[in-house]
Amino acid sequence: MASQTAVSARSAYRQILRATRIAFQDDFRVLVAARQEARRQFDEHRREGIDTPMQINHAKEVATILRHNIVQGVRDSKDENAKWELRIHDDIERGDNDSIRVGGKKVKVDKPCSA
C-alpha cells in the first residue's frame, strides 16, 4: 500500500497535468514543455525528504496558478496588425478594480466575465 505522502504527490502531479491542459489548450509546444518541466521536477525530488510536504504544497499552488491566473493570447501570425484575442476559460480568476483596494485580504470573485 502506498504511503500518504506518495498518494499526495501523485495527486499534486495529476493536478498539474490537468492545469496545464486547461491553461495551454491549443498550444501544443508550451503544453509539452510545461509537462516536461513538471515531470523533471517530480523526478528530481523522487525520494522522500524533510521538505517533501512543502514541495507537494508548492506543486498544488503551481497547479492553482496555472488554472486560475494564466491567460494565453493568440493572433493571426500572417497579419502583424491583427489584434490579440485572449483565451479566457471558465476557471480564470476574474476581479474588478475594487478588489485592488482591498490590501492584504483575500477577495472571492464569483461572477463570470460577462456579468
Swiss-Prot record:
The keyword Mitochondrion applies. It comes from the Eukaryota. GO terms for molecular function: protein folding chaperone. Keywords: Chaperone, Mitochondrion, Transit peptide. Residues 95-115 are annotated as: Disordered. It is found in: Mitochondrion matrix. GO terms for biological process: mitochondrial respiratory chain complex III assembly. Transmembrane segments: none annotated. Residues 1-36 form a transit peptide. One of its GO terms (cellular component) is mitochondrial matrix. Interacts with RIP1. Assembly factor required for Rieske Fe-S protein RIP1 incorporation into the cytochrome b-c1 (CIII) complex. Functions as a chaperone, binding to this subunit within the mitochondrial matrix and stabilizing it prior to its translocation and insertion into the late CIII dimeric intermediate within the mitochondrial inner membrane. Modulates the mitochondrial matrix zinc pool. Belongs to the complex I LYR family. MZM1 subfamily. This is Mitochondrial zinc maintenance protein 1, mitochondrial. The lineage of its organism: Eukaryota, Fungi, Dikarya, Ascomycota, Pezizomycotina.
